[in-house]
Amino acid sequence: MLDITYVRQNLAEIESMLQNRQLASEKPRLRQLLEYDKNRRELVQRSDEMKAQRNKVSKEIADIKRTGQGSGEELIRQMKEVSDEITMMDATLSKLASDIEEILLSLPNRLHESVPTGKCAEDNVICKAPVPYLHLLDFPIKNHLELGRSLGILDFERGAKISGAGFPVYIGKGARLERALINFMLDYHTDHHGFTEVFPPFFVNQESLRGTGQWPKFADQVYHIEEDNLYAIPTAEVPVTNLHRNEMIDAERLPVSYVAYSACFRREAGSYGKDTRGFLRVHQFNKVEMVKFTRPEESYQELEKILMSAEAILQALMIPYRVLLLCSGDISANATKCYDIEVWSPAEEKYLEASSCSNFEDYQARRMNIRFKADSRSKPEFVHTLNGSGLATSRLMVSLLEHYQNRDGSITIPEALRPYTGFTSIDQLTS
């Protein structure tokens, strides 16, 4: 959430940000916000004056009663009128505060100066050229669906029977491979990159979703359990970032770095017409997430570290990938700067998003009231929060299966995963 003072003092920047994000339609709400803010500040001043007058009259009434000079009835009548007006003002102020917060919660974050201006995904900038790991595929290539079926390791049909479309079932060595990927990534981030592992709840309350920015803007994308008023998490970012909600973090601990595995649940409302085959778009998937809390002056340096940590996984697995810097029209509403890592699918002949690494500056921390003090004499400041997928297994599995397939239809397990799988290949089923 943006600071209302910052919005008021940097109106031209905020309007430009909305324009660059292709959200010019939000400008009337911005003007409404400033009108609410102006009315609130004027009313606060008037309310303070009235309260000062009430205190003055109360003292005069007390003096009259103490000295016995008159009944003070007129002053009592005046004080009642003032008190009634203050009560009405307080109610109006409460409504204005609610209206201001509602608009602030819906406004997107500011953009970092390095974010390229663009309208859509086609305008994203390739900031790291494709990193090729040559796997000789000089035979007809099968896609991950064909491989999963022929090897007996993936079953989307039974998943649909159990839960509906978008809920895959991993079987046998497929289940072992999925678990191996998760454990490998967790170990890599904790052992090589200094992250502390967290195993968070998979269901959160509305306040947690609001803290990270998924609520109310993306309310239609989350699964809701009405009886308990809990929500299935769309990403481990939500519970892990909320670990420090309403807390003051010791400055000496910063940056705080967490990594967490979770299942992720997304309704994917509005995905009609998009490619939903296999793992390309699912309602439930597994992901390892990195989350950082940093000092403001260190957050962009830490963003680069998160990106390198995610890249290191693909380098260890020898999966071809590229890195994009998202443009202003494609970046998420909460982020000031975001990199996407895309893995290559030989069968689809295109890149698939497998990770997003984002800096939110104080946008989430302000919502969640997460602060630190640089030293004992300093005023509390909001931390900066960052996160990055490290990685999502679904699209990673697509690229892995397709790249490591062999002419006979078997899959060779990448060397980095073999200590976790306990096997070196997945062979064709025999009838």
Curated annotation (Swiss-Prot):
Which PROSITE patterns does the annotation name?
AA_TRNA_LIGASE_II
Q: Name one GO cellular component term.
A: cytoplasm
Q: What is its main location?
A: cytoplasm
Q: Which GO terms describe its molecular function?
A: ATP binding; serine-tRNA ligase activity
A GO biological process held by the record: seryl-tRNA aminoacylation
Q: Kindly report, in one word, the top-level EC class recorded for this enzyme.
A: ligase
Q: Which residues bind ATP?
A: 266-268, 282, 353-356
Pfam families hit by this protein:
Seryl_tRNA_N, tRNA-synt_2b
Keywords (alphabetical) are: Aminoacyl-tRNA synthetase, ATP-binding, Cytoplasm, Ligase, Nucleotide-binding, Protein biosynthesis
- Tell me its EC number(s), please: 6.1.1.11
Q: Which NCBIfam families match?
A: serS
Task: Relay the domain remarks.
Answer: Consists of two distinct domains, a catalytic core and a N-terminal extension that is involved in tRNA binding.
Question: What protein name does the entry list?
Answer: Serine--tRNA ligase
